Amino acid sequence: MLSYLTRLTGRDREEFYDDHLAHFLTFNAGAANAGGFMAFQRYTSHMTGIASASADALAIGEWQLFLAGLIAIIAFVSGAAFSAILINWGRRKNLHSQFAVPLLLESLLLAVFGFLGDWMQQFHAFYFPATALLLCFIMGLQNAMITKMSGARIRTTHITGMVTDIGIEIGKSLYWNRDPAYSTEHHVRGDRKKIRLLMNFVALFFLGGLAGGIGYNWSGFIATLFLATLLFLLAIMPVLQDIIRSNR
């Protein structure tokens, strides 16, 4: 188990571990997204929706809503940028934890959100923007990490691209290769393994959303600590490796 956790978020990557890690992170994104909606009626991983809502707000002169959406997008971009900085710094230092550090930071931020969420609600003017910015930053942080780790093959915080790719592969699978002039090597074939993988991601995002919604309704912000613990366990082994190595 310890070896598996080390390889899951460690420096030396294989497609197998990228795919396994993406399963955990897709569930996490679905849960955090649903919890954010329960907390303040906004989805924080869905930049397409936020951008559309901002454009609509600007069109009807709702300047506050427009600025709120713009700041949310900036927070997501900032999270992605900070993740890239951490990863590139870790790569320059040749750290085992170059990909684990952004996850560990995400874990700590979710823990802060879980512990302080109820207390923050008393500050109405501060609560909603702070919560939205924190969750958007977290989603950007995670999405950039798995994007860089997998060479842009996988993203976990939204499913539009996943559903599109499923449709493409289904279309390729249904394509009739009837032209005898084409050799079999030029036949169009769907990637069934990719379809299964992407369908798993979509299902896990849905299940994460279900778990996040139920968890928030049942216990409030403290439910976020489950996600924080999950990410901490995923990230801690490569970090400990670097700590041990630095103390030798």
Name these PLM-found stretches:
Residues L2-R248:
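Alpha-helical transmembrane segments of multi-pass membrane proteins
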